[in-house]
Amino acid sequence: MDDTITIALCCIAKDENPYFEEWLNHYKNIGFDKFIIYDNNSSPSIIRYFTDNNISTKNITIINWTDEEFGSQSRAYLDCCQKYSDFNYIAFFDLDEFYMSKSMNVKEDLKSLDYPDGLGIYWRIYGKS
């Protein structure tokens, strides 16, 4: 693999609009290239919230996802993998989950692990919020 890593971040959210700005800034700062957000009937919609609050949608794709069936998250993530398979990596983090490492650079972390095919990351819970 060449040294150019492309990495996308995918999530599905419903009514979590106030948390997007912090979440996006965190992941942009540590090296993610693209954000794919599945809007599961948020009110207001995520795109409306971004527009009303002047949040940039550069490198962000928002997909209306109104799947009411059980397993909606799994189907959204499968859809993401199929549509965005041109990325070297796709990560899945909810809006209350933040990737942290000593380097705080996800691409450097992947390089240091010799470009793994897959990576599982353990939770660390810091107590009540």
Predicted features along the sequence, with ranges:
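Cell-envelope/extracellular polymer assembly enzymes that use nucleotide-activated donors
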Residues: 6-8
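Active-site beta-to-alpha loop of glycosyltransferases that engages the nucleotide-sugar donor
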Residues: 11-25, 41
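Short, acidic, metal-binding catalytic loop of nucleotide-sugar glycosyltransferases
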Residues: 25-34
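Short acidic/polar active-site loop segments enriched in Thr and Asp
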Residues: 33-34, 88, 117
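Short beta-strand/loop segment that forms part of the nucleotide-sugar
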Residues: 33-41, 63-66
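Short acidic donor-binding/metal-coordinating loop in glycosyltransferase active sites
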Residues: 40, 94-98
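Active-site-proximal specificity loops/subdomain of glycosyltransferases
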Residues: 45-92, 100-101
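Conserved donor-nucleotide/metal-binding helix-loop-beta segment in metal-dependent transferases, i.e.
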Residues: 101-127
